């Protein structure tokens, strides 16, 4: 008997209040890294009706106009009208940054005898994941959820659906049979809108112009449940509807619940923070394992102690899909990937102003030129070392 189950993931648009906060935090990080790539940054943002608060710890030689960066980011997202509850020109921006604690800095900045022996900026555990459900090696529900809100933003920006507003959420439920995606069961999309659009017209346009063009044709089987703005009116949104905070969408940022999460958010953190850099490295490792054909699913866990460079643990789980044992793959990971914090920074070239782009529509599964952790350049070496035939993605 086939093992049949449903699995759901969600995403949110760039205009969701928590994502507004994430993007401001990462825009500030990028501006700092452009001037001083060795800065220590932990930039937190709160945004509410007409108000943005910037706080956290920053140690840098850069000279940054934080208020202007916050306003520019809000404008780019699309909050350019007082009717939206926050607009880039009229909102108040409060700045309350401190410097990084010297107690933390002493462990992060020590070089020891090895120039790659920088200690981790904190203790913690991080996960990376990849699977063969999509060409991007991502779980299908989160991949489709991202594409839906990305399309919502595209149609809003180019004016095809002029009544769309920046805030939106999506949710996709996929039916799996024997562990593989079989069909789309339910799609939820809630979008902020202008007050004068009638609900029936909105629902028809969202289904025909946003949802249907996004769904893979081979997974449309039978009747799909489309739930568009199921509560009806959604005029008040963005930071006016809910207070936004950096780091509150960590499952949206990663794998949509298909893999565990260590709990540490990404946005606003420079790459000395392993919450971010080691999660990126975990994705890089997992993606190369799957791309090499060593497994069809791979979960990586790494953990760190503050001030210590070497990971305290490295774990690989292929859920029984491995062509060699998990112990062999773990050994290969240790041989082919430098998972010390400074080794990760060097391996993935992370001291670049590349982070604002990550702060909406997922940090993983996007073929962006800056996203070095999405490369599969280690896959062939892994396949050869394991003695297996590489997949078509590598050959």
Swiss-Prot record:
Enumerate the subcellular locations listed in this protein's record, separating them with semicolons.
Answer: Cytoplasm
Cellular component GO terms, alphabetically?
A: cytoplasm
Pfam families from the xrefs? S-AdoMet_synt_C, S-AdoMet_synt_M, S-AdoMet_synt_N
Q: Which residues bind L-methionine?
A: 57, 100, 242, 273
Sequence positions that bind K(+): 44
* Stretches for region Flexible loop: 100-110
The record lists the catalysed reaction(s) as: L-methionine + ATP + H2O = S-adenosyl-L-methionine + phosphate + diphosphate
Q: What is its EC number?
A: 2.5.1.6
Please tell me where Mg(2+) binds in this chain.
Answer: 18
Say if the entry is tagged with keyword Lipid biosynthesis. no
What is the annotated role of this protein in its UniProt record?
Answer: Catalyzes the formation of S-adenosylmethionine (AdoMet) from methionine and ATP. The overall synthetic reaction is composed of two sequential steps, AdoMet formation and the subsequent tripolyphosphate hydrolysis which occurs prior to release of AdoMet from the enzyme.
Q: Which family does it belong to?
A: Belongs to the AdoMet synthase family.
Subunit structure comment from the entry: Homotetramer; dimer of dimers.
**Protein name, as recorded:** S-adenosylmethionine synthase
């Amino acid at each position: 008997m086939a093992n049949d189950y449903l699995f759901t993931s969600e995403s949110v648009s760039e205009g969701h209040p928590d994502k507004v906060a994430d993007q401001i935090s990462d825009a500030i990080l990028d501006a700092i890294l452009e001037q001083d790539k060795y800065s220590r940054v932990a930039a937190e943002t709160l945004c509410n009706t007409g108000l943005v608060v910037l706080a956290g710890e920053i140690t840098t030689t850069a000279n940054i106009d934080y208020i202007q960066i916050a306003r520019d980011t809000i404008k780019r997202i699309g909050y350019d009208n007082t009717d939206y509850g926050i607009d880039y020109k009229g909102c108040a921006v409060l700045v309350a940054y401190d410097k990084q604690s010297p107690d933390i800095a002493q462990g992060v900045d020590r070089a020891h005898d090895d120039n790659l022996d920088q200690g981790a900026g904190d203790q913690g555990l991080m996960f990376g994941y990849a699977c063969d459900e999509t060409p991007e090696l991502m779980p299908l529900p989160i991949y489709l959820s991202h594409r839906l809100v990305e399309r919502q933003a595209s149609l809003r920006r180019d004016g095809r659906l002029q009544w769309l507003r920046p805030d939106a959420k999506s949710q996709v439920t996929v039916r799996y049979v024997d562990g593989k995606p079989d069909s789309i069961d339910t799609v939820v999309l809630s979008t902020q809108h202008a007050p004068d659009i009638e609900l029936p017209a909105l629902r028809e346009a969202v289904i025909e112009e946003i949802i249907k063009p996004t769904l893979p044709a081979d997974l449309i089987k039978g009747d799909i449940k489309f739930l568009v703005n199921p509560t009806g009116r959604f005029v008040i949104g963005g930071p006016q509807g809910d207070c936004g905070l950096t780091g509150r969408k960590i499952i949206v940022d990663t794998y949509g619940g298909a893999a565990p999460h260590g709990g540490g958010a990404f946005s606003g953190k420079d790459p000395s923070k392993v919450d971010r850099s080691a999660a990126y490295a975990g994705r890089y490792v997992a993606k190369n394992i799957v791309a090499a054909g060593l497994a069809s699913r791979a979960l990586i866990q790494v953990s760190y102690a503050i001030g210590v460079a070497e990971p305290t643990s490295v774990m690989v789980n292929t859920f029984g899909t491995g062509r060699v044992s998990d112990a062999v793959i773990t050994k290969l990971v240790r041989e082919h990937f430098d998972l010390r914090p400074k080794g990760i920074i060097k391996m993935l070239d992370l001291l670049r102003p590349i982070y604002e782009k990550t702060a909406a529509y997922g940090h993983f599964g996007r073929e962006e030129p800056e996203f070095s952790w999405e490369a599969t350049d280690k896959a062939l070496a892994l396949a050869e070392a394991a003695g297996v035939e590489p997949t078509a993605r590598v050959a």
